[in-house]
């Protein structure tokens, strides 16, 4: 059984202007997530939902000033961002970043290699990736496109759920994953999340408004 423990977490937003002071957002957050649990964190805009997500993941604009985040007893705050991912943490952002010049195919296989510790065999990987894309109604041609470049909101979200299914993290933090989705896209994304959780027992934290 895996456990994610957030203990007395304080965090602040680091301003882009170095002449401005950091803005404290989180004040002593405590949360424990055990295997098989789904948690929904609800609150108005500006209440700190995204701050909690990004701070745990290690975003440089969000500085943790006090507390611990333990994944199976290991303090994530002592790890670099890539080490947190390899430890089993996954973040789906509200506004996924576009990465021109890097194809989805290369990104996904490189990410899987980093997380799994070895490169998946080409034939097996192609079968695995195509199957996951089919389940999310992603056109195979998208694998040759640059990451999120020119994607619709629904396509970006499906790409993130595709990553979730292929990387198989211990814990997934989904930041307002329903934002900007129409009814059909929301259904596909929701089914993808439910399907993955049923198979792998991933434990989801869902910041939402």
Regions from the language model: what does each represent?
Residues 4, 26-28:
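Conserved structural motif at the start of ABC-family nucleotide-binding domains
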Residues 42-44:
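The feature captures the beta-strand-to-loop junction immediately N-terminal to the Walker
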Residues 68-84, 148:
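ABC ATPase NBD Q-loop/coupling interface
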Residues 97-170:
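ABC-family P-loop ATPase nucleotide-binding domains
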Residues 176-177, 184:
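Walker B catalytic motif
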Residues 186-199:
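Helical segment within the ABC ATPase nucleotide-binding domain
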Residues 202-208:
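Conserved small/polar residues in nucleotide/adenosyl-binding loops
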């Amino acid at each position: 059984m895996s456990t994610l423990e957030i203990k007395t977490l304080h965090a602040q937003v680091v301003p882009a202007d170095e002449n401005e002071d950091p803005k404290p957002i989180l004040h002593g957050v405590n949360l424990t997530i055990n295997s098989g649990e789904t948690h929904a964190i609800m609150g108005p805009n500006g209440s700190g939902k995204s701050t909690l997500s990004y701070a745990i993941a290690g975003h440089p604009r969000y500085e943790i000033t006090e507390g611990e985040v333990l994944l199976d007893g290991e303090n994530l705050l002592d790890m670099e961002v890539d080490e947190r991912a390899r430890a089993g943490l996954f973040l789906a952002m509200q506004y996924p970043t576009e990465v021109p010049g890097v194809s989805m195919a290369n990104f996904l296989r490189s990410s899987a290699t980093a997380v799994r510790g070895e490169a998946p065999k080409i034939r097996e990987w192609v079968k695995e990736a195509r199957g996951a894309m089919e389940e999310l109604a992603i056109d195979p041609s998208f694998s040759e496109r640059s990451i999120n470049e020119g994607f619709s909101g629904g396509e970006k979200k499906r790409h993130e759920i595709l990553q979730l299914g292929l990387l198989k993290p211990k814990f997934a933090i989904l930041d307002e994953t329903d934002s900007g989705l129409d009814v059909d896209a929301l259904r596909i994304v929701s089914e993808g999340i439910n399907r993955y959780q049923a198979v792998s027992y991933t434990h989801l934290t869902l910041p939402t408004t």
